[in-house]
């Protein structure tokens, strides 16, 4: 029995163009690699992912979330590998409600010219987007 499953999510409007790619190339590539259908509302940033396999929809959702949070699509596509995962940590969990504290934490995590972030990525074998 073939039954369609779906997931709806929202990404920032300024990341919609990155998700779609030049002439739709990024979206097509994701759809082909995951065997899903992605529908994007450019005005609102709403994304609908449809398919017949829950796991593929889950992985596609993580790829879309990663792109929406600032990752390059080629890095986000690494999530297709079973030993890769997406983990999002809210800086406000550590900064409280203070915008100054949030900016300070972001600055420390990035470092001068991104050196701290690059060092963290190398030491932990991860990709980090702040």
Residue ranges of each PLM-predicted region?
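RNA-contacting regions in translation and RNA-metabolism proteins
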Residues: 1-130
């Amino acid at each position: 029995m073939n039954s369609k499953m779906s997931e709806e999510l929202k990404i920032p409007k300024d990341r919609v163009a990155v998700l779609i790619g030049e002439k739709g190339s990024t979206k097509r590539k994701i759809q082909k690699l995951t065997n899903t259908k992605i529908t994007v509302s450019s005005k609102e940033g709403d994304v609908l992912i449809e398919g017949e396999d829950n796991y593929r929809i889950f992985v596609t959702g993580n790829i879309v979330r990663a792109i929406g949070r600032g990752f390059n699509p080629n890095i986000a596509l690494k999530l297709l590998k079973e030993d890769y995962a997406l983990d999002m940590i809210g800086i406000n969990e550590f900064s409280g409600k203070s915008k100054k504290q949030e900016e300070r934490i972001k600055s420390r995590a990035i470092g001068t010219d991104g050196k701290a972030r690059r060092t963290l990525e190398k030491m932990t074998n991860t990709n980090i987007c702040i």
